Amino acid sequence: MLDEYPDIVIGCAGGGSNLGGLIAPFMQDKLLGKADPRIIAVEPASCPSFTRGKYAYDFCDTGHVTPLARMYTLGNGFMPAANHAGGLRYHCMSPILSKLYHDGYMEAVSAKQTDVFEAATLFAKVETILPAPESSHAIRGAIDEALKCKETGEAKTILFGLTGTGYFDMSAYEAYHNGTMTNHVPTDEELQIGFDTLPVQPE
């Protein structure tokens, strides 16, 4: 394979399983001081647990069966708006990834649905691979970082996770191309409804 080590590692983020698997070897190097790649999570703007959530103890499920875990969460009662990246519609983030983000070892950004599909369409035209909507969040992040490099004249190796194809998501691509796709970004008031469902912790 390529004899390259990434300067930037980018993955899509919903609950964190895919992202965790992608970044694990690079995060190990970072924690051991062997390398210092930037690690970036890209999540949907409609379900922004990293970028707008709270670092708090919460249930991982809506049935309140799981043990409480400290993580970035929108509250177990938060109901994300419907979007075409169903695999990223989850109210909270992996406790391990949450700790890494909280301690400054990784970054997070959010992306609107139409911006994600713009990136997905470009990728499909250039690489002849139709990416899954979830993967397309990472593609959006990779394109944005590449454009920054173009502006600054820097040469950086960017690794992103392409986790699946979008052949079962043709209706989503159709909605993007015919202009009916919408973006939902929750208001602070909508987020507060979810935060109000966080379990109360004793002092």
Walk through the language-model features, giving the residues of each.
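Short alpha-helical "patches" and their helix-cap loops
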Residues: 7, 102, 108-111, 153-162
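C-terminal structured "cap/appendage" subdomains that terminate the fold
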Residues: 124-163
